[in-house]
Amino acid sequence: MKKTSLLLFIFMFSLFLSGCRQKCSVTPLVRGISFSCTVKYYNECYDGEASVAENGDTDIKITSPEGLSGLILHFKGDDATAEYSGFNYKYNISEMPEGMAFTYLYEMLRAAKKGEVSLEDDKYFTESKKGSRICRLYLGATGLPISAEDASNGFSAEFKNVTVMGK
């Protein structure tokens, strides 16, 4: 009887440990969507509206703070264009210094497309690493993004009104 109890305990304990961070069947739905979001990065807060095409091309319009309101960012692969008051600036995101909040958000969404989804503490997420940064994009049960964070630098994003385009 003691052996059976011990075996049962070991089995239950191993199930408990394996459930701490398990792989799951949720697929990230980070393309073909539109959303509004609030991004906090380096003690600054930004609001924006975004659309991500099926091919990954992403447009983000910054709506606040007032000094940046109206700035539109177009991302395609590693190339980006910033538009503001009729002026355009083209750049390669890999050549820009870290610190551009919405560029960081775009990179997280792009990495999530091919990321593996895990489950921890009843939260689905993808994790991507770039240098010392460890970025997590949290997903709902449908695969749509809910929030994102990088504890190493204080980056966080909250997704609102996420909709699948064309549906």
Task: Describe each model-derived feature in a short phrase.
Residues 27-54, 75-76:
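Post-signal peptide N-terminal segment of mature Sec-exported envelope proteins
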Residues 21-23:
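Bacterial signal peptide processing site
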Residues 16-19:
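C-terminal motif of bacterial Sec signal peptides marking the signal peptidase cleavage site
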Residues 6-13:
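Sec-dependent N-terminal signal peptides
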Residues 1-4:
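Positively charged n-region of N-terminal signal peptides that target proteins for export
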Residues 25-35, 39, 82-133:
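Flexible, processing/modification-adjacent segments and terminal tails
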